[in-house]
């Protein structure tokens, strides 16, 4: 029968750090059952902390904490020294090392890492947005966009959308095809958020031919015909003029360069 150890984890935030450490450590003791039913998050007062520590002492538990408040850290340390409670403070020793090295005190703000993580989650949300509203899918999403890219096929709309999404911009894009009516919702779109992309007919023809070849298809189609491409570009220019949309020529430009120019255009208009 496995030996059982009761573990209390205490944090003034979510407590994920202590949970991860416990999971890593327990993996090294396959013959011990760690009972971690007591996970106390958002502990912010000394009174609440001491009640938890008293219960842990009664249960003869091992206590792991990730507190950042000096007041709470001191209270827990004094309690464990006075009572013999088996207590591990994960944060204070690291804080002391940093303070000794840099001479800077911690800000003692619980949950700070999760605030920083918001930027990451905002980026993920922007990427999901770009995927959802790529290539004119569900035009209703245009109104929620930070940027709407418009252009004929193969003018880098999708890769530029994804690049900008990785920087936190909510980007949708719309392919312009002469035979396909524009979505009515375009009339409601803020012109300040729209950017047109164009490319030289010759370069566009080469890009489209390469695309068809990669799919194992022949390239003798209207899709790669320079005259047809010129017609598409002329139509796109009409749309850009109608809505007052600034235009960026992506010929021989990298995705990064195009994205930089787009942000520059937006800054000029705002």
Swiss-Prot record:
Family assignment from sequence similarity: Belongs to the pyruvate, phosphate/water dikinase regulatory protein family. PDRP subfamily.
Known role: Bifunctional serine/threonine kinase and phosphorylase involved in the regulation of the pyruvate, phosphate dikinase (PPDK) by catalyzing its phosphorylation/dephosphorylation.
Record's protein name: Putative pyruvate, phosphate dikinase regulatory protein 1
Tagged with keyword Kinase: yes
InterPro entries, per the entry: Kinase-pyrophosphorylase, PPDK_reg
Enzyme class: transferase
GO MF, any single term: phosphotransferase activity, phosphate group as acceptor
The keyword Transcription is assigned to this record: no
Keyword tags: Kinase, Nucleotide-binding, Serine/threonine-protein kinase, Transferase
Lineage top rank: taxon: Bacteria
Enzyme Commission numbers on file: 2.7.11.32, 2.7.4.27
Binding site for ADP: 151-158
Annotated source species: Enterococcus faecalis (strain ATCC 700802 / V583)
Catalyzed chemical reaction(s): N(tele)-phospho-L-histidyl/L-threonyl-[pyruvate, phosphate dikinase] + ADP = N(tele)-phospho-L-histidyl/O-phospho-L-threonyl-[pyruvate, phosphate dikinase] + AMP + H(+); N(tele)-phospho-L-histidyl/O-phospho-L-threonyl-[pyruvate, phosphate dikinase] + phosphate + H(+) = N(tele)-phospho-L-histidyl/L-threonyl-[pyruvate, phosphate dikinase] + diphosphate
Pfam families given in the database record: Kinase-PPPase
């Amino acid at each position: 029968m496995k030996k059982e150890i009761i573990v209390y984890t205490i944090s003034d935030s979510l407590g994920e750090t202590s949970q991860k450490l416990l999971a890593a450590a327990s993996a090294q003791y396959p013959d011990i059952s760690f009972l971690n039913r007591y996970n106390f998050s958002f502990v912010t007062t000394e009174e609440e902390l001491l009640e938890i520590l008293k219960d842990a002492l009664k249960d003869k538990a091992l206590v792991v904490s990730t507190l950042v408040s000096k007041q709470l850290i001191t209270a827990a340390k004094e309690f464990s020294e006075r009572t013999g409670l088996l207590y591990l403070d994960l944060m204070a020793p690291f804080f002391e090392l940093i303070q000794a090295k840099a001479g800077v005190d911690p800000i003692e703000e619980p949950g700070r890492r999760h605030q920083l993580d918001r930027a990451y989650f905002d980026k993920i949300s922007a990427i999901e947005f770009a995927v959802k509203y790529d290539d004119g899918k569900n035009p209703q999403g245009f109104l929620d966009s930070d940027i709407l890219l418009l252009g004929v096929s193969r003018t880098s709309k999708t890769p530029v959308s994804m690049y900008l999404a990785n920087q936190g911009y909510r980007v949708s894009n719309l392919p312009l095809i002469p035979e396909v009516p524009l979505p009515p919702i375009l009339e409601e779109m803020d012109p300040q958020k729209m950017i047109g992309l164009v490319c030289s007919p010759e370069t566009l023809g080469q890009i489209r031919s390469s695309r068809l070849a990669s799919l194992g298809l022949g390239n003798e189609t209207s899709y790669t015909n320079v005259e047809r491409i010129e017609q598409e570009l002329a139509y796109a220019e009409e749309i850009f003029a109608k809505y007052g949309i600034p235009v960026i020529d992506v010929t021989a430009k990298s995705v990064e360069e195009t994205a930089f120019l787009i942000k520059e255009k937006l800054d000029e208009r705002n």
